[in-house]
Amino acid sequence: MKVKAVRGIANPLGTIDAHGTVIESIANAGDGVDILNRHREKIGSGFVHLEGDNVILTGYVDEEQYTAEKIEETGLSVGFNANGVKAREIDGVGYYKDVTITEVSLTPLPSNKGAKVTKVREENKGEQEQMGANETQEIMKQAIEAGVKVRELEAKVEELNKEREELKKEREASIPSEKPEDAERKFMRELGSKMAEMPEQGFLREFANGADLNVVNSLGSITSKYARKSGIYDGAMKARFQGLTLAEDGVDDTFISGTFKAGTDKNKSQTATKRSLRPQMAEAYLQMDKATVRGVNDSGALSEYVMSEMVNRVIQKVEYNMILGSVDGSNGFYGLKTATDGWTKQIEYTDLFEGITDAVAECSISDAITIVMSPQTFAELRKAKGTDGHSRFNELATKEQIAQSFGAVNLETRVWMPKDEVAVYNHDEYVLIGDLNVENYNDFDLRYNVEQWLSETLVGGSIRGKNRSAYLKKKGSLGV
């Protein structure tokens, strides 16, 4: 029986085919594969291996089953299994890694122009057996030189596939999507393990309970791309965040001479007492909505979730605590509302327009002022009239124009702000981390550093100095 020995480039790795697909690597180098005619009937057998960046096919084709006159002018096309792994898509192109080649076809119109037959030799069946042994020895030699025997490769791939399936089953069993509390535990485990890797060198921070907390000096500044997900931070490039970690007994570097807490004597040094805070308490410390971790069922989804939804949720929570504070002060925020430290002026008003004017004057250290109020209070402000009975604002005036009329930069409405109450602060001077040793923080970009973002729990700090903020409340208002 006449057969043709065929050798060719089954797929040039890293190149785009006509379907917008790129194969970056394969998982079954050295495995046997069927050779088909245009992805239909079987016409021969062979195996695939790697030579440089090319997947090479070596095999035999039965002349009686494949009648094309010039196999050497024929292209090649691979069929593959992605093993359940989704393609990484960039600009409409799908990139696949560690795929399993299931078959290689001879075709006159290959989807990848670089995939083609490079060598053809005609011989008898008896010669085929001898050549098959020789070719096999050649490929085995190449594989052995690479550190892996060909006959062991199939077992290794099978073992890896089994491990992948076991891990998948284990993950699905331990984190069922219908139980958000399990997803939360998974998230906190990941967070705890990441935080445990962080260095144990820290400094005192301006928390309400700063003397009771030990923190690491791995700071990160949130980038403008993510800061602007929430308009209250437009232009506030001094928003810095930091994570909590466990402390080593005897470490005495949490205190920096000369640091102070808002509301205390600036010249009075603080006593550096320490207390470890377990990473698992980060959720309670932040008082974040439990929904932040719902739907997270594997590490890939966790990264994607952290990079999108979690960023927005945390910023919104920081805004809330920044202005209203927490009921018991456990989260370390100095809320502007009902501040008793003398650093945030508490103003009662009868005329909303005049009250905001007075509050802006209290923040006169610079012009970078933000005004925050509820939508209902804003609606009232739009209708405000002067002493002459005329409206103070044009009915088509935008928030920016109204803010500018007070000498402010931003005017934001938030549904969680109590009615008839207004927060005014200077966003260039407001720092979420009130350390005075800012030269030692490690800046990072959330778009590229998922691991660092994952390892950091976002927490807030305090207003730094007087003439930065004021809080308005309508006289006699219950603030509901």
From Swiss-Prot:
Instruction: Specify the domain of life of the species encoding this protein.
Output: Viruses
Q: Where in the cell is the protein located?
A: Virion
Question: Does the keyword Transferase feature in the UniProt annotation?
Answer: no
Q: Which Pfam families match?
A: L_lactis_ph-MCP (PF06673)
* InterPro entries cross-referenced by the UniProt entry: Lactococcus_phage_c2_MCP
User: What keywords is this UniProt entry annotated with?
Assistant: Capsid protein, Coiled coil, Late protein, Virion
**Where mainly found?**
virion
Q: Which residues form a coiled coil?
A: 138-175
Q: Name one GO cellular component term.
A: viral capsid
Q: Where is this region: Disordered?
A: 163-184
Q: Does the keyword Nucleotidyltransferase apply?
A: no
Describe the task this protein carries out: Assembles to form a prolate capsid about 56 nm in length and 41 nm in width.
Protein name in the entry: Major capsid protein
What is the protein's species of origin?
Answer: Lactococcus phage c2
Gene name per UniProt: l5
